[in-house]
Amino acid sequence: MVETNKNLPAWRKAIAAAAREVHKGEPIDEPLITRLDFYLPKPKKPRWLVPATALDIDKLERAVNDGLQDGGLIKNDSRVVQSISEKHYAEERTGCQVTVFRHGATAVHIDFQPR
């Protein structure tokens, strides 16, 4: 699949690097739930209170899930059985907060800001 947003591959690589930093063990190989909060640049005059604009949330989710797999946090992105995602305007830094929950158990948290 070809990415239509030129920044998503860089996000994916950065998320993979962040995943490697926080998770040193074997990839998680069980059903997972993700909580993804995307913090996007706020325009000078936003049309809406939230960023209902260009970056599609499903493409952002895919980039994160692929990055989590590439970074060895999860065995396969097909293990994500539920995802709760929101786009917000960034007050300070842009990026993504990622929390991965084992279905019915504990969580792994990643606070990712692109450099």
Question: Which positions does each model-derived feature cover?
Answer:
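Acidic, proline/glycine-enriched N-terminal capping motif
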Residues: 1-115
